[in-house]
């Protein structure tokens, strides 16, 4: 293009006005090439690997090798690992190592997936980051330092805290409320220092960048077309979306890009513009992409004086380094999150908090099984003898479930925002992984010492394992086929048990057994049918409760309630039931001596149906057509009163003449020991629900209405890590959906005298739509005619029945504050029951010794106890030398190095006693596992020695200029003593002596 042909373009740029003039000669554009590769959304992982993923990595590596200035960031490690292990040639692998050494290829975030931030539990966020970081560090010796959370539907305040603990220096998010983003753009507030934890504050702050309204895609600058499913073209001939950059098209591209850049530059405080270049499933033909951008970039840089911008390819590290070098004091954001997320008026993304409820439950149960399997395997491997187990095989079983649990944390995975084939993929991977870990635990159970002398063969041995690091007293429930049963411990002593008709299966029986198990320990129970023919039998039978039936009652609208009450109680609560309605009426709580009015019922929101132009509920959105209405017409009730527990069974019928119920509430109160061991068991009402199948375009909630004067204030958790205060937001058209929040593990409402806590074993949407009310969305069934839904079969027309579980805690704040966290963990990590046949007299040989319990103080939680099986040296210098020499190929897993993570459960100032720092001697606490010979403190995911971790220090407007670190600035760890402060998560490598 000659000088005269340049004049028309220059005139057009001048017409852009003051905005362009403002940034004349100033703007530096950092072009960050990337490909957004969903680990399951519209296509399965297998389909994506078949169609385009290997082409992305192969062509990107080739393109970067051909051009020294080119850059690329890679995000999802599940895809990269699959390519590295199954597709990459030796040449490609060497090229990757060279590009990493030159810092032209950068791994950002580094997890297995780009995890969701609303409905994931922080345990699983840490897991998926740990798995990805471990692979990258072991393979390349690198440690990601910048995040790329650009597609999750809202941003939690927990994620930035975890990333800071992992050693990150910068955090990128995108999807926040459209109106808030617009305000932040116009006030240049898209960049800030985020202190995501109210207790950790500046110690774990992180610089955060919110992508502007253009987000992570660069529309109009994609030259490699779109991948073709289900099969890639044999000749790799993809029709390009955009016309190539040429002399004829140059003016078009320059004008559009400069206009775009100058708009963006006005929204930020520095003249450094982050320009994400890429989008979903891009760069599978990277040479074509880079060839066009090279020409455009060369032209713009040649005319920088006229255009006022310069461009360069960049990694995130290069962009953040440039911003960090600026003399700017940044705004500080506190522990508030960015939830819920709205993309437009009346488009609030709160439906996915409940979508695919069954998958959400399976994912959380898989995580709990993995947690138990990790610690049981660790105890077993550290014991004196392990006769039957191949450690390599065992590690493979754990690894498969680690990957499956990590995979489903993807922001289109556990969210339920995927097609049904992808759901089936997640389910298959989770169930296969769970079967492997269950087989591993069964193998360990076979090797556990058991001495039992029985008069005759028959029955089963149940090994019940407590994966928590404190003594748990609880009731386990087993399903048996016989109504008369005895339960004894391995010494033959009778155990308190209760057998009753199954609440769901007419031909079976529920056997409830009271158990007390120390931390990381197990108990054996012998379960045998009692034979009536033996009249002289001395076997102690499980007790049989009495059952009272209450006839069908129609839903009443006259408000005449509370005249005929039936009490059901244990030592902590009395639940009053109304015989005239068959509904809960109120609860009396012992410690406060207060009776709180409380009723529960199922209601349904109806969504707009069938209209192509309407905004309607789908996998993502919750857009109800009005307020919730009762979803039932009649209810029947049973009360089962026993020595061990009392159970209230309420069956709700959609129509009064229905033969089968659609909904049910099963409420249990346990009659446990009256000492401190039974405190948690006594102070909870365990509820299980049956919901479904639903009518089409119905979204069903359980609403609990109380006499608490809550002022429409709700508290819900961020990923099970911390609580957020939610005040009611009024909106003319969208108040219902706008006031729904994710409940990953807990929520509560309160007034000056009492607090009602809900604990959940899986994620749900939760809301308070009225004073004293809290409602939990349990299930959804949706279908519409929107083009998007029909094109991809992205439907939520599920006819399943779901059985979620909630535990209720009621009492004064001091009581519930002390119990909420530990009760939530007892729900999340219930004892695991492992069965085996009992054949006459059993006297096992000298297997692993009966091990000592591991017990932590009540304010600390053993977040993980695991043998990761990593092969790398803990010494970074040694590890890099081993990589250079190729020694990693011959390295073996270290089974004496244990990953230990401790979490302080309480916020600073939350509880008078439990919020204090806790000092403990790790050598003493872990003596039940073996002899500790060395303790190393590590970053959250284990890849950094904290003594060598020095994160960037960002200047802030409040005057703090604090050098961030992965922990409280204390002297280096010397010896086994460690102090854990409120909300800290501390990670260690514990090295045990060889037996």
Swiss-Prot record:
Please give the tissue specificity annotation from the record for this chain: Specific to the caput and corpus of the epididymis.
> Where do the record's glycosylation annotations fall on this chain?
285, 593, 625, 657, 733, 793, 875, 977
Major location, coarse class?
secreted
Spell out the reaction equation it catalyses: Hydrolysis of terminal, non-reducing alpha-D-mannose residues in alpha-D-mannosides
Q: Which SMART domains match?
A: Alpha-mann_mid (SM00872)
Q: How is the cofactor bound?
A: Binds 1 zinc ion per subunit.
Q: Where is this region: Disordered?
A: 956-977
Q: Which GO terms describe its cellular component?
A: extracellular region; lysosome
Q: Does the keyword Zinc apply?
A: yes
Q: Where in the cell is it found?
A: Secreted
Q: Which residues bind Zn(2+)?
A: 36, 38, 151, 411
Tell me which positions the record assigns to the signal sequence.
Answer: 1-21
EC no. given is: 3.2.1.24
What biological process terms from GO does the record include?
Answer: mannose metabolic process
- Please give the cofactor(s) recorded in the UniProt entry for this protein: Zn(2+)
> How activity varies with pH?
Optimum pH is 6.5.
Keyword Hydrolase applies: yes
Per the record, the similarity remark reads: Belongs to the glycosyl hydrolase 38 family.
User: Any idea what job this protein has?
Assistant: Can digest both p-nitro-phenyl-alpha-D-mannoside and high mannose oligosaccharide (Man(8)-GlcNAc(2)). May be involved in sperm maturation. Has a possible role in specific sperm-egg interaction since sperm surface mannosidase acts like a receptor for mannose-containing oligosaccharides located on the zona pellucida.
Q: Would you tell me the protein name for this molecule? A: Epididymis-specific alpha-mannosidase
Species for this entry = Sus scrofa (Pig)
Q: What is the lineage of its organism?
A: Eukaryota, Metazoa, Chordata, Craniata, Vertebrata
Q: What would be the name of the gene that encodes this protein?
A: MAN2B2
